[in-house]
Design a protein with these regions (language model features):
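Membrane-embedded alpha-helical bundles of multi-pass transporters/translocases
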Residues: 2-481
Length: 481
């Protein structure tokens, strides 16, 4: 029995030796997590109609904004590279990382207090198309999420960052699965009694479990938490690198908030349609793009630190080609099989056929940028590994302004339905990635991309031919694909 526990422990805390093995573990666990995530969405669609789900999804907008600024802005671009840089000195590592975590958490408390006090004032400006009763419900649920979910989720994500910096990915990948399970269970057992409070309760419990399950990572790390805030070199580096990335996230969150605002003018259920279509498109992006990006950062940072520029260049070319090889066929599948996919994932009792069709069309326009969206996360990590967070920031600001401009034109000038927001997103994402690619090429210098362009062309042509043949050889008379 002791031998069994020892093997289990070694398996859970084993360190990965390559990007491929790390990305594989992350991808498998993200697939499982996303599977439960879509069971969550299907469960919600079975208990609540799309108008009611508007309230639920809109309640996450403000908590998500705070979370993205503090965690996505801090963790992905700065925390992991700094952790790796100081991990050879245990004392300095513990002081520096503890200071960073404590500083961010104090900032979180400040945001929570301010937002809870003034939420009723500015929420009507975010959701102007909602009734007063609907806005009051959004405010109530937003406060519960700010107070009950956010602290656990923020601390849990710092543990995730520590695990990834140590190249220990299994436990950090299990945590989101349990988060989704908690929401599903709470909805099934309590939705009929406490309505939308049931999934909100599940979110809070899930966030707590998300934190607790990752606490063992502290034991198996050279980092020892200290309750201190100390002016260290690492803290200054952290904020110097974080500020551009945080501004990128702020602009992106403004973009997401404007999307919510615009959908409130498009009728009841529009935000649910937009939200579900976007998250279905994010399934392959998360499994492939985000997983690969997360797994690549520690290795890219290490190569840059050791001056292995040629290996860095080779990994960039090979990684982009591998990502295209996986995502271009998936993009085609999502476009041609959009309606069955939406019905499969979201076809609950209260999710009617009109909602299915509108979500499917929106999904197809989101999917056009799927390969570029997947590569985006890897390209930004390349810049972060080179200790450059400013370039992705400037490019993101430009692409987000483009997205907002197109969205406003499509909705208020041409009066297009909700799928127009997906066209705006895809256009801006493609532009973003193309500019990132060009600037990264210049930054690395002397990189041969001929094989990348040649193989990508082959993949694209083969995918197009296979998709067209499959589409027109389907059962005669069917028009729902």
């Amino acid at each position: 029995m002791e031998r069994f526990f020892k093997k289990t422990k070694n398996f859970i805390f084993s360190k990965q030796g390559s990007i491929v093995s790390s990305a594989l573990i992350l991808s498998v666990m993200i697939i499982v997590s996303r599977f439960f995530g879509f069971i969550r969405y299907r469960t919600l669609a079975g208990f609540f109609n799309k108008e009611e789900l508007d309230i639920f999804f809109a309640s996450f907008r403000i908590p998500d904004l705070v979370f993205e600024i503090l965690i996505t802005g801090a963790l992905t671009s700065t925390f992991i590279p700094i952790f790796i840089r100081y991990q050879n000195n245990k004392k300095e590592l513990s002081e520096s990382i503890s200071t960073i975590i404590n500083t961010i958490f104090l900032g979180l408390i400040f945001f929570i207090v301010v937002l809870c006090l003034f939420l009723e004032i500015f929420m009507p400006f975010i959701t102007p198309g909602y009734s007063q009763i609907k806005n009051e419900q959004v405010v109530l649920y937003s406060r519960l999420l700010l107070l009950g979910q956010l602290p656990f989720l923020v601390l849990g994500n710092f543990l995730t960052g520590i695990g990834q910096a140590n190249k220990t990915f299994l436990l950090t990948a299990i945590a989101p699965i349990l988060y989704n399970v908690a929401i599903i269970v709470a909805t099934i057992f309590f939705a009929n009694q406490i309505f939308l409070l049931a999934p909100i309760l599940g979110v809070i419990v899930g966030a707590f479990v998300f934190l607790i399950i990752q606490l063992p990572l502290l034991i198996h790390s050279d980092f020892s938490y200290q309750f201190i805030i100390k002016k260290t070199k690492a803290l200054l580096e952290f904020f110097r690198m974080m500020v551009p990335r945080a501004f990128t996230v702020i602009v992106a969150q403004i973009d997401a908030t404007i999307d919510l605002t615009l959908t409130t003018f498009l009728g009841a259920g529009a935000y649910t349609v937009f939200y579900l279509a976007q998250h279905l498109q994010l399934l392959p992006v998360s499994v492939i793009g985000i997983a690969f990006g997360q797994a690549s950062l520690p290795y890219l940072s290490e190569m840059n630190t050791r001056g292995k520029s040629e290996e860095f260049k080779n990994i960039v070319v090979e990684s982009i080609l591998n990502l295209f090889f996986l995502t271009i066929p998936i993009m085609s599948f999502f476009v041609f099989a959009r309606t069955p996919l939406v019905r499969l994932f979201f076809g609950g009792e209260k999710f009617d056929w009109d909602a299915t069709v509108l979500t499917a069309v929106t999904l197809s326009y989101f999917s056009l940028s799927l390969p570029f969206h997947s590569i985006y996360y890897f390209l930004t990590r390349c810049f972060y590994a080179l200790l450059d967070s400013r370039t992705p920031f400037y490019i993101s600001v430009f692409s987000i302004i483009l997205n907002i401009s197109l969205s406003l034109i499509f909705i208020f000038v041409f009066h297009f339905p909700v799928w127009a927001l997906a066209i705006s997103f895809s256009t801006s994402m493609i532009v973003n990635v193309l500019v990132l690619f060009v600037l990264l090429s210049r930054k690395m210098g002397n990189v041969d991309f001929s094989s990348l362009f040649r193989e990508t062309a082959k993949i694209s042509v083969a995918t197009l031919l296979a998709s067209v043949i499959s589409y027109y050889s389907k059962t005669p008379g069917r028009t729902d694909l």
